Amino acid sequence: MNIQALMQQAQTMQKKVEANVENAKKELGNKEVHAEAGSGLVKVTMTGRHVVKRLTIDPSLLEDEPDMIEDLIAAAINDAVRQADALYEETMAGATSGMGLPPGMQGMF
């Protein structure tokens, strides 16, 4: 195999990876994760692209201390971020599978 053929193969692979990654990013924007804190008193819905779509606070919680509400909101959002990160890793691994990329390369996208 000559160097020119190797370069063409690399360019073809790069274009395929870029297309797969773009499709995966669109897919992530449409997928949602759901998290909660305080046994469901605070619920968060977030996309795979870390966009918070909905925050629900149980009305009974509004009568309590603001510090507790803030802590539960932070806990629910942090849980949603962890789930969205896992969804991202899973989706990107699928988008780049079969490409022969070295381990850890998916994180570059």
From Swiss-Prot:
Keyword Membrane: no
Main location: cytoplasm
Cellular compartment(s): Cytoplasm, Nucleoid
A GO molecular-function annotation: DNA binding
Assigned GO CC terms: bacterial nucleoid; cytosol
Keywords noted in UniProt: Cytoplasm, DNA-binding
Function: Binds to DNA and alters its conformation. May be involved in regulation of gene expression, nucleoid organization and DNA protection.
Subunit structure: Homodimer.
Similarity remark: Belongs to the YbaB/EbfC family.
Protein name from the UniProt record: Nucleoid-associated protein Pcryo_0799
Organism: Psychrobacter cryohalolentis (strain ATCC BAA-1226 / DSM 17306 / VKM B-2378 / K5)
